[in-house]
């Protein structure tokens, strides 16, 4: 029975990674009014992995999406890769702490919005550390954090819908 659950778990995580990667590649093709603003829909799969299997699964989905996505888009080890990795690590860590603490107290919307805020904040810190003068930080924060928060709320709403709609399935794989 354990082997069957492990196979189901691995295949489910594989599907989440594939979906996250597909959304990541799709988002890269969408023109944006600001270069750093993306919908962040690929983070939906990280959140579902976190809520279904815990922090290790969420971290795995995020890392595979960021690394494989960067390899496919030709940006591996570029500044954009560093920003994506820093944001992904920060958001996954914050969301994992919220989930581990007692995620029933937090809605997927709150977890996602907080993770998106951490994602944007980490990206601004990396930008400030490597590319910008520290005086640019106050100017840049609202331009990054407000779209991040909006994206996080949208992702949280979608996660809630997916979790409610597929509740019967998630019980079987968790």
State where each predicted segment sits.
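Hydrophobic alpha-helical transmembrane segments
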Residues: 10-15, 44, 48, 56-63, ...
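Alpha-helical transmembrane segments in multi-pass membrane proteins
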Residues: 16-23, 50, 61, 65, ...
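Helix-boundary and loop/linker segments of multi-pass membrane transporters
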Residues: 2-9, 36-37, 73, 101-105, ...
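Hydrophobic transmembrane alpha-helices
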Residues: 2-49
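Interfacial aromatic-anchored transmembrane helix boundaries in multi-pass membrane proteins
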Residues: 23-39, 64-95, 131, 136, ...
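Generic transmembrane alpha-helix motif of multi-pass integral membrane proteins
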Residues: 41-56, 94-99
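Membrane-embedded alpha-helical hairpins and interfacial helices in multi-pass inner-membrane proteins
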Residues: 76-78, 82, 97, 101-174
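Helix-loop interface residues and adjacent transmembrane-helix termini in multi-pass membrane transporters
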Residues: 29, 52, 102-105
